[in-house]
Amino acid sequence: MERIVNQSEMQEDFNSELSLRPQKINEYIGQDKVKERLDIFIKAAKNRKEALDHTLLYGPPGLGKTTLANIIAKEMGGDLKITSGPAIERAGELAAILTTLKDYDVLFIDEIHRLNRNVEEILYPAMEDYALDIVIGKGATAKSIRIDLPKFTLIGATTRIGMLTSPLRDRFGVLCAMEYYTDEELKEIVSRSALVFGCAITEEGALEIAKRSRGTPRIANRLLKRVRDYSEVKSNKLVSLKEAREALELLEVDNQGFDKVDNKILEAIIDNFNGGPVGIETLSYFIGEELGTIEDVYEPYLLQKGFIIRTPRGRIASDKAYEHLGRVNNSKSKSNNGKVQGSFFDK
């Protein structure tokens, strides 16, 4: 069973996200700095009758990268073509996609850091010169043919900008860092989504869902649907603070947006390893989760919120973790004042 607080897209998200997506940049909630920059760049490109510079959107999953790509395509008057790094296995597949584009179209490549290197090299002339270099024949008879491409915009999305090669990263003219949303921004998103769903909700109910959504609109909309279900069965269909709290407690999503596995990790570090440090492999074995799952799924948000600290010797529980679980920290010297080390997006 998938986690309801999983930031990555789940099957149930696909259709609902389509209906909830804003169509214009001024309808997009949150990411104010990103919106302001993109609005200026889009207007400037349209005034010059040029395509928008190739754009890289990076940050945690679920923050609206695909939605922004769709908005950019609409603002530029082009179509949006969506694919992903893992889906393009051969250079010919990417070439086929590129040759179907028209002027001002947007090609959106999700997880662009996972592109095959041979495929990636096809992008270099496409991004720099709007051209595609194709080699025909083999050996001494081989010759290169250049095919002109339309003036399109490539939008790459990644959760790990540090994994992009320098040649690819340097070819993006616009780089936008997507940040976690505030509770107030998420409350606005929840209220808007409730209107689309035909669900009555109070401000307090919307804020309670927002607070437990891990700064992520995708999770907020997912929780809203489950709270709506609870309210329709258990009460008068109005999602109030009471219904929101009861539904979220039933879903085992606490007031920090943590689920039972998040709390299990914190409990293991504090109760079984005296607050740490504990090696990630030992922690993985102890809680029964794969090492990669802990590093990629659970740990990033706990690090970002400052509940655990990553050190060369292992993971340490911060003062916030002790407070959250109602424990007394008898080894505060280990907590390094609760500061999070490093950036987990650049691993």
From Swiss-Prot:
Annotated positions binding Mg(2+): T66
Keywords: ATP-binding, Cytoplasm, DNA damage, DNA recombination, DNA repair, DNA-binding, Hydrolase, Nucleotide-binding
GO cellular component, one term: Holliday junction resolvase complex
Entry binding sites for ATP: L20, R21, G62, K65, T66, T67, E128, D129, Y130, R171, Y181, R218
Catalytic activity: ATP + H2O = ADP + phosphate + H(+)
Compartments where found: Cytoplasm
Annotated region described as Large ATPase domain (RuvB-L), given as residue ranges: 1-181
Pfam families: AAA_lid_4, RuvB_C, RuvB_N
Region Head domain (RuvB-H), annotated ranges: 255-347
Disordered: annotated span: 328-347
Its EC number(s): 3.6.4.-
GO molecular function, one term: four-way junction helicase activity
Low complexity composition bias: residue spans: 329-339
One example of a Gene Ontology biological process annotation: DNA repair
InterPro entries tied to this protein: AAA+_ATPase, AAA_lid_4, DNA_helicase_Holl-junc_RuvB, P-loop_NTPase, RuvB-like_N, RuvB_C, WH-like_DNA-bd_sf, WH_DNA-bd_sf
Segments of this protein annotated with the region Small ATPAse domain (RuvB-S): 182-252
Sites where the protein binds DNA: R310, R315
Gene3D superfamilies: 1.10.8.60, P-loop containing nucleotide triphosphate hydrolases, Winged helix-like DNA-binding domain superfamily/Winged helix DNA-binding domain
SUPFAM superfamilies: P-loop containing nucleoside triphosphate hydrolases (SSF52540), Winged helix' DNA-binding domain (SSF46785)
The record's note on its domains: Has 3 domains, the large (RuvB-L) and small ATPase (RuvB-S) domains and the C-terminal head (RuvB-H) domain. The head domain binds DNA, while the ATPase domains jointly bind ATP, ADP or are empty depending on the state of the subunit in the translocation cycle. During a single DNA translocation step the structure of each domain remains the same, but their relative positions change.
Functional summary from the UniProt entry: The RuvA-RuvB-RuvC complex processes Holliday junction (HJ) DNA during genetic recombination and DNA repair, while the RuvA-RuvB complex plays an important role in the rescue of blocked DNA replication forks via replication fork reversal (RFR). RuvA specifically binds to HJ cruciform DNA, conferring on it an open structure. The RuvB hexamer acts as an ATP-dependent pump, pulling dsDNA into and through the RuvAB complex. RuvB forms 2 homohexamers on either side of HJ DNA bound by 1 or 2 RuvA tetramers; 4 subunits per hexamer contact DNA at a time.
Assembly with partners or alone: Homohexamer. Forms an RuvA(8)-RuvB(12)-Holliday junction (HJ) complex. HJ DNA is sandwiched between 2 RuvA tetramers; dsDNA enters through RuvA and exits via RuvB. An RuvB hexamer assembles on each DNA strand where it exits the tetramer. Each RuvB hexamer is contacted by two RuvA subunits (via domain III) on 2 adjacent RuvB subunits; this complex drives branch migration. In the full resolvosome a probable DNA-RuvA(4)-RuvB(12)-RuvC(2) complex forms which resolves the HJ.
Family per record: Belongs to the RuvB family.
Record-linked NCBIfam families: PRK00080.1, ruvB
Annotated protein name in UniProt: Holliday junction branch migration complex subunit RuvB
UniProt gene name: ruvB
